[in-house]
Amino acid sequence: MSQRKIQKVMVQPVNLIFRYLQNRTRVQIWLYEDVTHRLEGYIIGFDEFMNVVFDEAEEVNMKTKGRNKIGRILLKGDNITLIHAAAQEA
């Protein structure tokens, strides 16, 4: 039996953000020092400081599950804790 070596490739953060942008994936952003609110929308641009232009942005209150549509915004990178693909709405 031959031994195959599986090589794992590290994914750079900028590449993952770019993939979200290219595929128009709806993402959720966790805010720094604000656990009660999150932002959901589509990344349409970003820079080397992780400043993000967000389209169709919604503010989600995690306590009440209420949503507030805020449209297109520029979110400064210092405010971002985590970016991930948003759960599909039923």
Curated annotation (Swiss-Prot):
SUPFAM superfamilies documented for this protein: Sm-like ribonucleoproteins
One of the GO biological process terms: spliceosomal snRNP assembly
Residue ranges of the TM segments: none
Domain of life: Eukaryota
Entry GO CC: cytosol; P granule; pICln-Sm protein complex; precatalytic spliceosome; U1 snRNP; U2 snRNP; U4 snRNP; U4/U6 x U5 tri-snRNP complex
Domain Sm, first and last residues per copy: 14-89
Alphabetic keyword roster: Cytoplasm, mRNA processing, mRNA splicing, Nucleus, Ribonucleoprotein, RNA-binding, Spliceosome
Record localization: Nucleus; Cytoplasm, Cytosol
GO molecular function: RNA binding
Family named by the database record: Belongs to the snRNP Sm proteins family.
Role played: Plays a role in pre-mRNA splicing as a core component of the spliceosomal U1, U2, U4 and U5 small nuclear ribonucleoproteins (snRNPs), the building blocks of the spliceosome.
Oligomer status and interactors: Core component of the spliceosomal U1, U2, U4 and U5 small nuclear ribonucleoproteins (snRNPs), the building blocks of the spliceosome.
Protein name as catalogued: Probable small nuclear ribonucleoprotein E
